[in-house]
């Protein structure tokens, strides 16, 4: 009897990725949900009287909605790090993962978790409570009995399979650093086994999202009240400012002497943001 096919899930704070692999050979294939890229945004949009939307579609719908529409919408993102201590975050995670299965059915993507061995990556420094909660969330969402795997193992295997690092070097001892959207995970691996891990389940890229939000408000102090009145504070804080952070990063990668500018919806602009200004704010954050 051939080995059972695998469905692997990288359930991230900002983006979530799905990968299918036959049971008899190592040939993983990422799942494209229609955006010409693997994965989708970890987001869910609850709509009064309508089916919830997930992924990039949820963010786009909220971004394009009128103020009247937004009064009937609830957008949730970045809930993964809070699933242990927050019932709301746990419920959002369940509904998001349910929504992925429904989206896959509608697009005939055949995730078929009940017919596959399902594994979900978790930060190596995560404790047993977090891992247990992840498996419970997945089971409640319809994925069956799920096994968790330390994310650094998947990261290292990916780099070895793509030729980024020789397998012989990978076995000697490797430090894997995963600075994700919600967590910061360090793992020292020897012969493919995590020997030591450390980091923080609360530190990650979302701290920079918040820093850029504060930077924007320093330059546009009148914007906050208008955001709150329009019900936009969450969307601007965690979505638009994340986009601004990512664009700033690309700009600085190209040329750190360049001054960065970015409009944030109808609420104003970040102007003349510099690398030195970023470093100064990051040190003081």
Residue ranges and their predicted role:
Residues 2-29, 163-195:
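Gly/Thr-rich phosphate-binding beta-strand-loop-beta motif of the actin/hexokinase/Hsp70
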Residues 11-15, 151-155, 182-183, 204-210:
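Conserved A3 ("GATE") glycine/threonine-rich loop of ANL adenylate-forming enzymes
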Residues 23-141, 211-212, 217-262:
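Phosphate-binding loop and its immediate beta->loop->alpha context
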Residues 32-35, 147-153, 202:
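Active-site nucleophile and cofactor-binding loops and adjacent substrate-binding regions
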Residues 93-111, 152-167, 281-285:
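Phosphate/ATP-binding catalytic cores across multiple sugar-kinase/actin-like superfamilies
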Residues 134, 141-164, 168-173:
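Hydrophobic, small-residue-rich alpha-helical packing segments that form membrane-like cores
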Residues 194-202, 223-227:
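Short beta-alpha connecting loops at secondary-structure transitions
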Residues 218, 250-285:
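Helical "lid/coupling" subdomains associated with nucleotide-phosphate turnover
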């Amino acid at each position: 009897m051939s080995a059972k096919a695998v469905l692997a899930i990288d359930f991230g704070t900002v983006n979530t990725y799905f990968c299918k692999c036959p049971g008899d050979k190592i040939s993983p294939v990422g799942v494209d949900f229609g955006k010409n890229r693997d994965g989708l945004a970890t987001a869910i949009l609850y709509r009064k009287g309508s089916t919830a939307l997930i992924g990039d579609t949820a963010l786009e719908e909220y971004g394009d909605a009128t103020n009247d529409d937004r009064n009937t919408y609830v957008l949730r993102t970045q809930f993964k790090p809070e699933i242990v201590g927050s019932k709301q975050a746990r419920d959002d995670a369940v509904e998001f993962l349910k929504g992925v299965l429904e989206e896959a059915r509608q697009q005939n993507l055949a995730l078929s978790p009940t017919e596959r061995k399902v594994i979900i990556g978790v930060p190596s420094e995560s404790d047993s409570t977090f891992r247990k909660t992840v498996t419970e969330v997945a089971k409640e969402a319809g994925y069956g009995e799920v096994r968790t795997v330390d994310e650094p193992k998947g990261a290292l295997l990916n780099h070895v399979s793509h030729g980024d690092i020789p397998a012989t070097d990978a076995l000697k001892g490797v430090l894997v650093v995963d600075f994700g959207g919600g967590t910061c995970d360090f793992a020292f691996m020897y012969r493919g086994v995590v020997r030591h891990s450390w980091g923080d389940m609360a530190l990650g890229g979302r701290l920079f999202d918040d820093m850029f939000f504060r930077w924007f408000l320093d330059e546009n102090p009148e914007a906050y009240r208008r955001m709150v009145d329009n019900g936009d504070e969450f969307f601007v804080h965690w979505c638009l400012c994340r986009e601004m952070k990512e664009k700033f990063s690309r700009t600085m990668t190209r040329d750190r002497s360049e001054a960065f500018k970015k409009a944030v919806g109808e609420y104003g602009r970040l102007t003349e943001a510099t690398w030195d200004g970023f470093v100064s704010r990051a040190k003081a954050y």
